[in-house]
A protein has these predicted regions:
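Two-component/phosphorelay signaling modules centered on CheY-like receiver
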Residues: 15-33
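C-terminal output helix
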Residues: 22, 100, 104-117, 121-126
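Acidic, metal-coordinating helix/loop segments flanking the phosphotransfer/catalytic sites
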Residues: 9, 34-52
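Conserved acidic carboxylate
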Residues: 12
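Acidic phosphotransfer microenvironment of two-component signaling modules
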Residues: 15, 36-40, 107
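Hydrophobic/aromatic residues positioned on beta-strands within the core alpha/beta folds
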Residues: 80-81
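As written
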Residues: 64, 92-100
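Conserved phosphotransfer microenvironments
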Residues: 56-71, 84
Length: 128
C-alpha cells in the first residue's frame, strides 16, 4: 500500500475537468492518484492510503456512488455532482462527506478539502 501524507484520490471521467483539478490540487501541496471509472477508483482505494477523495457521482463507466461507499469512514470525501438530490443521501449516511455542486470553484474545493482534513486531524487528536 502506498503511503503519502497528502494523497488524494480524484475519480472523474471527464479529462477537461480532471486535468485542471489535479493541477490545482498539486499546486496546493497534494499528491494525486486519479481514476476514470468506478472500477479504477475501487482499485486505487485498495492500493493507496489516502487522506481524502474527490469523487464525481456520474461516470460513464460505473457509479461514483460505489466508490464513495467503499472509502473508509475516517477518510473525508468530497462529492461533486450537477444533481444535488442524488448526493444528499450519501451526505446523510456517510460521515465526513460533503457535496460541492457543479459547476464548482477549484478554490472552494481546496478550501473545503483543507477544512475537512483539519476537522479529521482534530478528531484524531481527541481520540488517539
Amino acid at each position: 500500500m502506498t503511503k503519502n501524507a497528502r494523497l488524494v484520490l480524484v475519480v472523474e471521467d471527464d479529462l477537461s475537468v480532471r486535468r485542471p483539478l489535479v493541477r490545482f490540487l498539486e499546486m496546493h501541496g497534494f499528491s494525486v492518484v486519479t481514476a476514470e471509472t468506478a472500477e479504477e477508483g475501487l482499485e486505487a482505494l485498495r492500493k493507496h492510503q489516502l487522506v481524502a477523495a474527490v469523487i464525481d457521482l456520474r461516470l460513464k463507466r460505473g457509479s461514483g456512488r460505489d466508490v464513495v461507499v467503499s472509502v473508509p469512514t475516517e477518510v473525508p470525501v468530497i462529492i461533486f455532482s450537477g444533481l444535488p438530490s442524488e448526493s444528499a443521501e450519501l451526505e446523510r449516511v456517510r460521515p465526513r462527506t460533503r457535496l460541492i455542486e457543479k459547476p464548482y470553484s477549484l478554490v472552494l474545493l481546496v478550501e473545503t478539502l483543507e477544512e475537512m482534513l483539519a476537522e479529521s486531524a482534530g478528531s484524531q487528536n481527541l481520540h488517539p
